């Protein structure tokens, strides 16, 4: 038995003609006549990885972004800063300082009061109807017999 070839040449030329054998680019176009094919190939790769163009594009993008940021800054007015209560060991002193402040005094008082209200645990208040309901439910349920015991038999 003969060994089979990995690469066959059978029908190869037909395959080439099916797709149309292409001439090198330098022969294909009138304008590129006499140009070195290797140079053209390199140009193709240069187009793909055009670093100079990319850098220009990035620079333009950066300019556009900075211009947009400046425009937004001009349009948006800075809002008043909310006073924040610092958390830590010096909270008491800073609280007193805030309260004594001529402008922030009122705001910080309401802000602190709100914080205190939110932190308090809410007491559970039971109504009379709710208090009676669990007691009735316990009374209605029959007492459970021990695990191995038999159910009582009713006499006829």
UniProtKB/Swiss-Prot annotation:
Biased composition of type Basic residues is found at 1-26
Positions of the UniProt region annotated as Disordered:
1-35, 116-156
Q: Where are the sequence repeats?
A: 129-136, 137-144
Q: Which Pfam families is this protein grouped with? A: Ribosomal_L29e
Please name the GO terms that the record assigns under molecular function: heparin binding; structural constituent of ribosome
Q: Where in the cell is it found?
A: Cytoplasm
Domain of life where this protein originates: Eukaryota
Which residues get modified to N6-methyllysine?
5
Q: Which residue ranges are recorded for the region named 2 X 8 AA tandem repeats of A-X-A-K-A-P-A-[KQ]?
A: 129-144
A cellular component term, taken from the record's GO annotations: large ribosomal subunit
| Location of Phosphoserine modifications | 31
Q: Does the keyword Membrane apply?
A: no
Spell out the subunit comment.
Component of the large ribosomal subunit.
> What protein family is recorded?
Belongs to the eukaryotic ribosomal protein eL29 family.
> What function is annotated for this protein?
Component of the large ribosomal subunit. The ribosome is a large ribonucleoprotein complex responsible for the synthesis of proteins in the cell.
Spell out the protein name for this chain: Large ribosomal subunit protein eL29
Q: What organism is the protein native to? A: Rattus norvegicus
Report which gene this protein is encoded by: Rpl29
């Amino acid at each position: 038995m003969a060994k089979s070839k990995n690469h066959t040449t059978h029908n190869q030329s037909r395959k080439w003609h099916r797709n149309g054998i292409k001439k090198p680019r330098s022969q294909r176009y009138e304008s590129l006549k006499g140009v070195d094919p290797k140079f053209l190939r390199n140009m193709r790769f240069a187009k793909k990885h055009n670093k100079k163009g990319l850098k220009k594009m990035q620079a333009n993008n950066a300019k556009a972004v900075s211009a947009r940021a400046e425009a937004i800054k001009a349009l948006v007015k800075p809002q008043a800063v909310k006073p924040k209560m610092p958390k830590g060991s010096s909270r008491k002193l800073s609280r007193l300082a805030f309260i004594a402040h001529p402008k922030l005094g009122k705001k910080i008082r309401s802000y602190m009061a709100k914080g205190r209200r939110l932190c308090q645990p809410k007491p559970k208040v039971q109504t009379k109807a709710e208090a009676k309901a669990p007691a009735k439910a316990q009374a209605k349920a029959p007492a459970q017999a021990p695990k191995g015991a038999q159910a009582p038999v009713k006499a006829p």
